[in-house]
C-alpha cells in the first residue's frame, strides 16, 4: 500500500514469496514473516539475502505467538491447510487480536481446501469478509477489524 510506513505480518510465510515481494516493492513498510517450519525459514532467509530485501524480519513462530506484543496494520496469510482447521482458525483468531483497529486481514485459500469454512470463521470474528479476487479455484478474502 502507498502512503506512510505500515506494519505487515506474513503468517505461514513459507519460503517467502508474499512477504519478500511486498518488502521489495515497498521498502518503507516493515514486514514480519512468520513460520514454524525451520526449512521454510532457512529458505526465506536465503531469498531475503539473494533479493536484498532489508525491511523484512523473519521469525520462527507458531501462528502469531512470537509477536504477541505487537500490532499490525495488515496481516496476510496463505494458511497451511494441511495443518488442519484448528490451526487455520487459530491464525484467524490471533490475527484479529494482533491487528490494529481498522487493520486488514488478507487470506489466500482454495475453495476445495476449506474456503467456505474459513470465510465463515473470519466473518464470525471480524463481522465482515469480502471475496476480493478469485481465479482457478483460489480466493483472496479480505476483512477489516472495526
Predicted regions and their residues:
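Glycine-rich phosphate-binding "P-loop"
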Residues: 77-86
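Conserved beta-strand signature within the Rossmann-like core of class I S-adenosyl-L-methionine
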Residues: 102-109
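Conserved class I S-adenosyl-L-methionine
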Residues: 110-125
Amino acid at each position: 500500500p502507498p502512503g506512510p510506513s505500515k506494519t505487515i505480518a506474513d503468517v505461514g510465510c513459507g519460503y517467502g514469496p508474499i512477504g519478500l515481494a511486498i518488502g521489495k516493492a515497498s521498502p518503507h513498510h516493515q514486514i514480519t514473516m512468520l513460520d514454524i517450519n525451520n526449512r521454510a525459514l532457512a529458505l526465506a532467509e536465503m531469498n531475503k539475502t539473494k533479493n536484498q530485501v532489508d525491511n523484512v524480519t523473519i521469525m520462527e513462530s507458531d501462528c502469531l505467538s512470537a509477536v504477541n506484543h505487537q500490532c499490525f496494520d495488515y496481516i496476510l496469510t496463505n494458511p497451511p491447510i494441511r495443518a488442519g482447521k484448528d490451526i487455520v482458525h487459530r491464525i484467524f483468531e490471533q490475527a484479529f487480536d494482533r491487528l490494529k483497529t481498522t487493520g486488514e486481514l488478507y487470506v489466500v485459500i482454495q475453495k476445495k481446501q476449506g474456503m467456505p469454512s474459513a470465510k465463515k470463521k473470519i466473518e464470525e470474528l471480524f463481522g465482515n469478509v469480502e471475496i476480493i479476487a478469485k481465479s482457478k479455484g483460489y480466493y483472496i478474502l479480505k476483512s477489516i477489524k472495526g
